[in-house]
């Protein structure tokens, strides 16, 4: 089969094309009173966050990676006036809780904007002062203090989550939290309408109308045969089973097994990739809490049973044994965050020490602040490329969270 614009058959194959989102004005629309609702713990300093992100992108380019930007692709996808109108309608339809009946006033504002300005405005949010209509509904008098008609989308620079490249297809995800639910609208329009993608017949393994939640940070492509997916607060068992069935029934898909790994439902264990990432053929970074749970984990291996013409599910409690079995590797190495130290490990886990981006086998991008983890990776033969992330990390995501591979070389 001829390669299309999406091909990801591993976590470690040489990264050739990646999707990023440069932090924008949405970060400056974060205010302390509404941080929890927008899933932030702190407010990044935009100017520094942009410099850090620009350096991240430049590091990838220097390693031979083509960098695409979500905001640019989205604007290029709505050149057709009818598509632009449908895009606006879809965004507003998912913002009714805050719009309070002022769709027409917001559309009037949007009509004054270019396509790029429109996308940027939707991402950054619409303040009430930009519309400034008179209160016409009781709910507006009651909710007068809330400053937005359209919430900002500060999590967008974590492009890993609203979508996931799997094989030559993609999942367009239904996000768990309302604050992030609109994010996958952008990739939906990009895949359907952008010249680079629209005629490529890209399989949509799951779309954003799926009734079950799934997020890309829980979706790991371990090999052309094996997916690992976290069962987490943000990714449901129902979504994983639906994805497995869709992939198994597609004759062009190569995947034979889906490994579902249950992780705790807490912010520290937000997604599977915050506690567990593949960095070489036989090496994984690992949060020490996962290592301590070895032998008591809930792991499920989903396969297609040709005899019964249905999926079959096996259970395991040992992650190391499971990975060695499904990947056909004799001795997998787990490299603990912060060397497993009770203090260093907890601190570096909070700063996404396990959330490494592998750009080819044995070569990773990490935050420089996680020096204990980085030194240990080097001792294990891994080449570590460090980036600064003092502001970026305030969003609780690392290099893997901030990137969506679109194309990797096969291994």
Curated annotation (Swiss-Prot):
Domain of life of the source: Bacteria
GO molecular function annotation: arginine deiminase activity
GO CC terms of this entry: cytoplasm
Active site: 401 (amidino-cysteine intermediate)
Any matching Pfam family: ADI
InterPro entries documented for this protein: Arg_deiminase
Localization of this protein: Cytoplasm
Keyword tags: Arginine metabolism, Cytoplasm, Hydrolase
Hydrolase as UniProt keyword: yes
Pathway listed: Amino-acid degradation; L-arginine degradation via ADI pathway; carbamoyl phosphate from L-arginine: step 1/2
The protein's Enzyme Commission number: 3.5.3.6
PANTHER family noted in UniProt: ARGININE DEIMINASE (PTHR47271:SF2)
Family: Belongs to the arginine deiminase family.
Name used for this protein in its record: Arginine deiminase
Provenance organism: Staphylococcus aureus (strain JH9)
């Amino acid at each position: 089969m001829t390669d299309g614009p999406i091909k990801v058959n591993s976590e470690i194959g040489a990264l050739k094309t990646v999707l990023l989102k440069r932090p924008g004005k949405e970060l400056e629309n974060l205010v302390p009173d509404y941080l929890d609702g927008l899933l932030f713990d702190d407010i990044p300093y935009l100017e520094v966050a942009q410099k850090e992100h620009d350096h991240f992108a430049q590091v990838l380019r220097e390693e031979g990676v083509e960098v695409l930007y979500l905001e640019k692709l989205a604007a290029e996808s709505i050149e057709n006036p009818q598509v632009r109108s449908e895009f606006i309608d879809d965004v507003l339809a998912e913002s009714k809780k805050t719009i309070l009946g002022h769709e027409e006033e917001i559309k009037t504002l949007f009509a004054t904007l270019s396509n790029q300005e429109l996308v940027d405005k939707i991402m950054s949010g619409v303040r009430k002062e930009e519309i400034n209509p008179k209160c016409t509904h009781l709910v507006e008098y009651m909710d007068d203090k809330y400053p937005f008609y359209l919430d900002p989308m500060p999590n967008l620079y974590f492009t890993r989550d609203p979508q996931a490249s799997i094989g030559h297809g993609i999942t367009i995800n239904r996000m768990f939290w309302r604050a992030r639910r609109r994010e996958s609208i952008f990739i939906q329009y990009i895949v359907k309408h952008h010249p680079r993608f629209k005629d490529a017949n890209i399989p949509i393994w799951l779309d954003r109308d799926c009734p079950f939640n799934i997020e890309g940070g829980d979706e790991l492509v371990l090999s052309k045969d094996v997916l690992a997916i976290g069962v987490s607060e943000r990714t449901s068992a129902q979504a994983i089973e639906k994805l497995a069935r869709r992939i198994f029934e597609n004759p062009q898909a190569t995947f034979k097994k889906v490994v579902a790994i249950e992780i705790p439902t807490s912010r520290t264990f937000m997604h599977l990739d915050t506690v567990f990432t593949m960095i070489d053929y036989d090496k994984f970074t690992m949060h020490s809490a996962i290592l301590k749970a070895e032998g008591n984990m809930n792991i499920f291996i989903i396969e297609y049973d040709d005899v019964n013409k249905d999926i079959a599910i096996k259970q395991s409690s040992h992650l190391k044994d499971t990975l060695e079995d499904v990947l056909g590797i004799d001795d997998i190495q787990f490299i603990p965050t912060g060397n497993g130290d009770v203090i260093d490990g907890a601190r570096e886990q909070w700063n996404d020490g396990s959330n490494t981006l592998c750009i080819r086998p044995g070569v990773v991008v990490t935050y420089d602040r996680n020096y204990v983890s980085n030194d240990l990776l080097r001792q294990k033969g891994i080449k570590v490329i460090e980036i600064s992330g003092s502001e970026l990390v305030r969003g609780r995501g690392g290099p893997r969270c901030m990137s969506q591979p679109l194309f990797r070389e096969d291994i």
